[in-house]
Amino acid sequence: MKNILFLFILISFFTSCKTREILSSGSIKRYQIEGESLINTEVFITDPLKLRFDTLIQSSENRRGYIDVNEQKVVETVKVRVQSKGLVNSVDYIGKKMVLGVLFEKQSEPIYFIMNRRGVLELYIDQSGNVPYNNHNFKMISTEIPYLEIVIRKNKVRSVSKTVMTGY
């Protein structure tokens, strides 16, 4: 019995490091991350009971922990919040890597990615080739992101779509 439990823990540890499917969302009721104030924060969870919080930011401030949620609902958008300064290499969506290169400000508004009919995420860029952002237009010139919130909108043409993000 102990061997089975040990094997289960070992498998859980290795699978948690991989890309996870985001199934639903809820609000935090309990967490185990030092130095964070997260109660009642909305989160997107990959497991009905627990979310492994593991950022991919390249920084000495990487945080890892477990979060329990009280309520669940069907996910409509996916938000990735990066609260420590660092470089974001890519967003992995069903094996499609997208390099982020946008100039950000602290406490910024979301940047939108749109899922096209083929299921590939595309950064929303206006007709002049700029990224509409905080009532300004920014060229894609930098990858230094002190605060990032990405919102992925599902294509309403597709009735069933799976949203997969690295970092959760």
Q: In which residue ranges do the predicted regions lie?
A:
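Bacterial signal peptide processing site
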Residues: K18-E21
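Positively charged n-region of N-terminal signal peptides that target proteins for export
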Residues: M1-I4
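Extracytoplasmic
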Residues: L38, R81-Q83, G95-K97, N135, ...
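Post-signal peptide N-terminal segment of mature Sec-exported envelope proteins
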Residues: S25-T46
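C-terminal motif of bacterial Sec signal peptides marking the signal peptidase cleavage site
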Residues: F13-S16
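C-terminal partner/receptor-binding element of secreted or periplasmic proteins
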Residues: L121-Y168
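Mid-length scaffold segments of soluble, non-membrane domains
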Residues: E76-M115
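Mixed-charge, low-complexity intrinsically disordered segments
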Residues: P48-T77
